[in-house]
Amino acid sequence: MTAVKQVKRAVVKAIADAGGMAVESYSAEKFRMSERAVTAVGARETVIEPRGGFEYLGQRADEKTQEVREVYGRRMALTLSLDIYAPRELGADGCETAAETVMQALMTALPEGLRLREMQLGQTEWDKVTGMFRLCASAGYAAYFLCERAEDETVFTDFVLKGTGKERE
């Protein structure tokens, strides 16, 4: 799974765990059927920081096999778009209420490897394409990824967002 997809999934999960509704991708048709406010999480900007290449962090022994693995890290800066849509029945207040849930989730419920740097909220406006109210927001993050390599291997394992475990697609 790509680094950006791992971050988007972590953000969607944090919002859902806080009681909000969030999706990684969306269509206007899908949103029109929703009775709740929905946050669409997308990638706006991604930067591998100059020092974001492979950084040697040390060694870790596997608890089960006692095999020693080298641990490397990678750092990324990214900005996500967080477009919050609310049906006409909820009004602009539906976006505002959902934005509060999103902000709370992003300040308190993210995995260890994802640190919120900044968050910006725009004004709620009527979106003609979806026929819903929309509040455009963005969140800037520092993301930290880890990978391991066994002593006898020359290939690195996949980089995984710190604090999320080894998810596979």
Each predicted region: which residue ranges?
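Small/polar-rich, solvent-exposed N-terminal microdomains that initiate assembly or binding
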Residues: M1-E63, G165-E169
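Short, charged, solvent-exposed linker or helix-capping segments at domain edges/interfaces
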Residues: G53, E148-D158
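Oligomerization/assembly interface segments of phage tail-like spikes and tubes
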Residues: E70-L90, G131-F145
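Hydrophobic beta-strand residues in large extracellular and virion-surface proteins
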Residues: V11, I15, V23, L80-I84, ...
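Generic secondary-structure microfeatures
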Residues: A43-V47, L80-R88, L106, L110
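Short, cationic low-complexity segments
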Residues: T154-E169
